[in-house]
Regions:
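Basic, flexible Lys/Arg- and Gly-enriched helix-loop patches that mediate nucleic-acid binding at interfaces
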Residues: 1-240
Length: 240
């Protein structure tokens, strides 16, 4: 790997900034000042320091976000803020992208990474990765709806795989229900459309889990953090 590419990947600065830092003698390779941006290094063997601090190269990064409403799950958009706008410069420099998508008015768990292989595995229909949602519903969900979900709902453009519907609470006076839904797919507006098929309406939707990942209750909407070592190991094992 070229030295300048390594330094950019470690978020030392932009390609132009890195070249200036090299000229200023602020970077050392194996204890010697290095000014050539084109120098080929082995990131697994060579010791690279910036202002005396050892730099560690990470090929892949993994972030958990509590996506807020009003933000879209994309890397760029001409009209709306994206989830990348919620990250800091260092995180954005890793060129991460959202794994799957949550609707603009849906909030909750979202994984961002630059690991394309992991993203492909999590989104592959063959793997049937479960995703769990908490929904506030206008209308009273009943046992017959549980059975309809379990059979697989035939929507206009596709038939849903059997899904698990749990009725957490109902309020007849307010004509509302709280439910938990687990699906193995992730089609456009799927949970909302499944509930609508039963004659009710989702008024708030939050994703709680994706595979082995569980939304951190300490993350406020719009906040994010790196996956813990344990979370990452369990996730990688689950798709191996």
């Amino acid at each position: 790997m070229r030295l300048d590419k390594f330094l950019v990947a470690c978020a030392v600065g932009s390609r132009t900034e890195v070249k200036n830092l090299l000229k200023a003698g602020r970077v050392t390779v194996n204890g010697k000042k290095e000014k050539s941006a084109k120098l080929q290094i082995d990131e697994n063997i060579d010791e690279i320091r910036f202002d005396g601090q050892v730099l560690e190269y990470e090929e892949f990064v993994y972030y958990m976000m509590n996506k807020p409403q009003g933000v879209i799950s994309a890397t760029e958009d001409p009209k709306h803020r994206t989830v990348l706008d919620l990250l800091d410069d260092l995180a954005r420099s890793k060129e991460v992208f959202p794994v799957g998508r949550l609707d603009i008015d849906t909030h909750g768990l979202l994984l961002l990474t630059n690991d394309g292989q992991l993203a492909h595995a999590l989104l592959s229909p063959k793997r049937h990765v479960d995703k769990t949602y908490l929904a506030q519903v206008k209308g009273i969900m009943a046992q017959e709806d549980v059975e309809i979900f379990a059979k697989g709902i035939p929507l206009k453009d596709f038939t849903c795989q059997p899904a698990k519907l749990e009725i957490l609470s109902t309020d007849a006076e307010k004509n509302q229900s709280q439910i938990r839904v687990t699906i193995a797919e992730g089609k456009f507006h799927q949970v909302k459309r499944m509930v609508a098929y039963c004659g009710k309406e989702v008024v708030d939707l939050q994703r709680l889990t994706m595979g082995t990942l569980v939304l951190d209750e300490n993350l406020q909407r719009g906040e994010w953090r790196r996956l813990t070592k344990e979370e990452l190991e369990v996730l990688l094992t689950s798709i191996a």
